[in-house]
Amino acid sequence: RRSSDLIWLGYGVHGNESSGPNASVQVAHHLLTSTDAEVQDWLKNAVILIQPSLNPDGLERFATWANMHKGKSPVADPQSREHIEPWPNGRPNHYWFDLNRDWLPLEHPESRARIAQFYKWRPAVVGDFHEMGPNSTFFFQPGIPTRTYPLTPTANQQLTAKIADYHAAAFDKKGRLYYTE
């Protein structure tokens, strides 16, 4: 296959953003069971790789804490114990490192394994799914221009802007709140 046929969907680089890993199962189920013509076309013309948890140790730490401290009915008080995850929380990996900061240095086993697979598969599209807090609206790129890494190719920035425009139009159509900076 050509690399243009490959899509990589990665969820939960921050272990305490559990919506991503949970959603990955639903995405896989949808792709496997949908009879929608558009979905069938995707599957006919592309390989979709799903990595359900980029940070399994952080996710396990968070799940253990959440199962001990959160109830079935959420508590509105922001000072309630269910809203205050202790350190080390689920964000970092086993070594208490934020794997979202390890894409270039590749110091950790999860990152090295992920990049080895990137080099093997060479995906054309990479989805890196995060979760916002319960009191936040949605964020999507391109974000603040001064935070753009100087060696990021212009074509990447242009594609990111097109994707952002697509999301903005969809959110505007539904009246959903979001921010990009």
Model segments located where?
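Metallocarboxypeptidase
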Residues: L49, A63-T64, M68-E181
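Short, small-residue-biased leader/transition segments that mark boundaries at the very start
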Residues: R2-S3
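Short glycine-rich or small-residue beta-strand-to-loop segments that form or flank ligand, phosphate
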Residues: I7-Y11, D98-N100
